[in-house]
């Protein structure tokens, strides 16, 4: 899979922290997020899912993710926003790849991306969260165009 390495600025994010199998929690989290964004007239900059764990190492019921929107630095969580978190995605070097997801199969492009990164001679995966940015409304279009971001660092030696 083709990818590029680019410096990313930190992103301030607001939304919901979810724990459990991603195929359930990501969908549920975005349903909650859409209701919150619509109900509070939030103007999201981006729609993002942040992934904190390696599903090959962490049991499905303990997988953590955030379903969030990026917001301006001066954003304040409005009243009556039960369960909403405000945090950030760290700045740094990220490997970035794009993919089209059909039939809700988000796993295949991520696996392909990780397999490509593991063969990189110059960069290795850094121990920070990964995230994906949605470039369209998959519920309306029937597919999702996404950008996948994996934190990287120079290989030692």
UniProtKB/Swiss-Prot annotation:
NCBIfam families from the UniProt entry: PRK10016.1 (NF007451)
Record keyword Cytoplasm present: yes
Family: Belongs to the DNA gyrase inhibitor family.
The organism's place on the tree of life at top rank: Bacteria
Assembly description: Interacts with DNA gyrase.
UniProt xrefs under Gene3D superfamilies: Regulatory factor, effector binding domain
Name this protein carries in UniProt: DNA gyrase inhibitor
Keyword Cytoplasm: yes
This protein's UniProt keywords: Cytoplasm, Stress response
GO cellular component, one term: cytoplasm
InterPro entries cross-referenced by the UniProt entry: AraC_E-bd, DNA_gyrase_inhibitor, DNA_gyrase_inhibitor_GyrI, GyrI-like, Reg_factor_effector_dom_sf
